[in-house]
């Protein structure tokens, strides 16, 4: 699929304490592998740095800002917010706030560690049948409030990603891809390919709502292909 390739999920040292990726190094890596867009989705934080924007433009990369919101039901990628708003750790409130601004919500890595019984003790969700996507949807209440599902995440196992894709298909969703990079070598390992070029978050949301996109993988090693 030809189009604009965007990594929907990255973290930098400017806004995520668990990241060791300098944003300038991230942009250099994006240019090197032919990635046209980067969504910077810091943890519970939206920052604005025009120097980053200018540097990205000079290198042929477009920056889109989002927030990875930590909610009571897991991480949710939020697009359309200019700053963190109190109370959005509750998914229902986050949904209301996003609707008010015409934004978009993505369930990030929704099945990470949830398919392995050894990790069941750390989750409050019911057990999930790895062979039945319906059970995954029923187990995660957050999926009732989001617009899309991250079906390929660079830090998830193949099983987790394929299961997320199966659940997305069950719900009639295409799924998106993001590397979840915290260091620059993994930038672009999972991407979302848009049919049309966009330059603002508003345009990005418009393309998502129009369904003109598909998840992809392997760009970081020069083996770009669609997922799965």
Residue ranges of predicted features:
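Internal, conserved structured core segments that host functional sites
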Residues: 102, 106-115
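Short, well-ordered beta-to-alpha junction loops that form the rim of enzyme active sites
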Residues: 43, 109-110, 178-181
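Active-site beta-strand/loop signature of hydrolases that rely on acidic residues for catalysis
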Residues: 36-44
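Charged catalytic cores and adjacent phosphate/nucleic-acid-binding surfaces used
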Residues: 1-12, 16, 20-29, 35, ...
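Conserved beta-strand positions in the central sheet of alpha/beta enzyme cores
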Residues: 39-40, 106-107, 150
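Short, conserved beta-strand segments within well-ordered enzyme catalytic domains
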Residues: 39, 62-64
């Amino acid at each position: 699929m030809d189009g604009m390739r965007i990594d929907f999920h990255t973290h930098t040292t400017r806004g995520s304490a668990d990241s060791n990726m300098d944003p300038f190094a991230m942009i250099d890596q994006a240019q090197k592998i032919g990635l046209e867009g980067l969504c910077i989705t810091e943890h519970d934080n939206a920052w604005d740095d025009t120097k980053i924007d200018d540097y990205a433009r000079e290198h042929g990369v477009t920056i889109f800002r989002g927030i990875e919101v930590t909610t009571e039901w897991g991480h949710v990628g939020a697009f359309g917010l200019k700053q963190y708003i109190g109370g959005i750790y509750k998914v229902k409130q986050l949904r209301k706030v996003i609707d008010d601004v015409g934004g978009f919500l993505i369930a990030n890595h929704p099945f990470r560690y949830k398919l392995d019984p050894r990790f069941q003790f750390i989750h409050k969700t019911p057990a999930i049948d790895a062979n039945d996507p319906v059970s995954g949807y029923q187990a995660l209440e957050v999926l009732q409030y989001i617009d899309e599902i991250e079906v390929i995440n660079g830090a998830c196992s193949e099983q987790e990603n394929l299961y997320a894709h199966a659940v997305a298909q069950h719900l009639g969703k295409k799924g998106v891809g993001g590397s979840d990079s915290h260091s620059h070598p993994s930038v672009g390992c999972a991407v979302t390919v848009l049919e049309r070029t966009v330059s603002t978050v508003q345009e990005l949301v418009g393309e998502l709502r129009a369904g003109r996109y598909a998840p992809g993988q392997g760009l970081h090693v020069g083996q770009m292909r669609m997922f799965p």
